[in-house]
Amino acid sequence: MKMMIAVFVSILLLMFSLSSTAMGMETEQQNMEERADVDFTGIADSIIKKIKETNAKPPARFDPATFGENED
């Protein structure tokens, strides 16, 4: 009987976790769509191009290998 309760609680926790993850992904998708719908009227084309290029790049990652010891 205790085993059934433990399994039931585990399943409920798993379902809650999955639903929370799905809701978070949905919110992120909505944020991305809102960002894509920005009105650029009155802004120079060169600035718009730079913004779109920046948004298309993957996020920067720290690479510790680039900070190796200098051989002077």
Curated annotation (Swiss-Prot):
Name it.
Hypotensin toxin Ts31
Residue ranges listed under propeptide: 25-35, 61-72
> What does this chain do?
Agonist of the B2 bradykinin receptor (BDKRB2). Potentiates the hypotensive effect of bradykinin (BK) and induces a direct vasorelaxing effect independent of BK, by endothelium- and nitric oxide (NO)-dependent mechanisms in rat aortic ring preparations. Also exerts proangiogenic, antiinflammatory, and antifibrogenic activities.
Leader sequence residues: 1-24
Query: What's the family?
Result: Belongs to the non-disulfide-bridged peptide (NDBP) superfamily.
Query: Which UniProt keyword terms apply here?
Result: Bradykinin receptor impairing toxin, G-protein coupled receptor impairing toxin, Hypotensive agent, Phosphoprotein, Secreted, Signal, Toxin
- Highest taxon in the source lineage: Eukaryota
Distribution of this protein across tissues and organs: Expressed by the venom gland.
From the UniProt record, give one GO term of the biological process aspect. regulation of blood pressure
* Cellular localization per UniProt: Secreted
Sorted alphabetically, the Gene Ontology cellular component annotations on this record are: extracellular region
Give the GO molecular function terms.
toxin activity
